């Protein structure tokens, strides 16, 4: 459960090689990616938290989908079609990743379709200061060649700013195995 009492759902996608990806509807997040190395040993290569509570106060947005606008907007100000908008300043003097209540810190609606999970949310006109209602989908596909693909789809009713991404971090030697500088 989130601090607001919303249910967190975990999904697991497995393929024929035994690899698996775990996702959660909190932040449309990748929480685990278990893959075989070149000797066939399985390791979780996605950096994340063992318990959902770790994601509630994670400034790095580990594994989560961020937006409305990934990255910074200088001084929390932007102009769209000649109109100036003021956004929350949440990173020094700048607006970062859509504000403190950005998409990474929300429950997404979710459904399973074959070997994919589709997560969606609606950001109302004026949400976090942005113009236009924005309907977003994040589609997570995982195939038998161990390819994980995230497709973001966005639809709006006004000209607006949208820049979605995922903040998953990897250690190809496996989580907890030390520095990433020795990857081969």
What are these regions (language model features)?
Residues 1-184:
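An exposed, glycine/acidic-rich loop-and-rim segment of catalytic or binding clefts
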């Amino acid at each position: 459960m989130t601090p607001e009492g919303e249910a967190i759902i975990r999904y697991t996608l497995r393929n024929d090689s035994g690899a698996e990806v775990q996702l959660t509807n909190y932040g449309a997040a990748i929480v685990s990616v278990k893959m075989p190395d070149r000797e066939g040993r399985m390791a979780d290569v996605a950096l994340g938290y063992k318990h959902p509570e770790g994601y509630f106060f994670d400034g790095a947005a580990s594994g989560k989908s961020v937006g409305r606008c990934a990255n910074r907007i200088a001084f929390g100000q932007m102009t769209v079609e000649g109109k100036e908008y003021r956004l929350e300043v949440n990173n020094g003097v700048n607006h970062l990743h859509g504000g403190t209540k950005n998409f990474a810190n929300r429950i997404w609606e979710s459904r399973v379709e074959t070997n994919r999970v589709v997560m969606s949310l609606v950001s109302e006109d004026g949400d976090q200061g942005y113009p236009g209602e924005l309907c977003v989908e994040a589609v997570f596909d995982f195939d038998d060649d161990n390819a994980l693909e995230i497709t973001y789809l966005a639809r709006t009713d006004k000209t607006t700013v949208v820049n979605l991404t995922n903040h998953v971090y990897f250690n190809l030697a496996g989580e907890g195995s030390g520095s990433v500088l020795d990857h081969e």
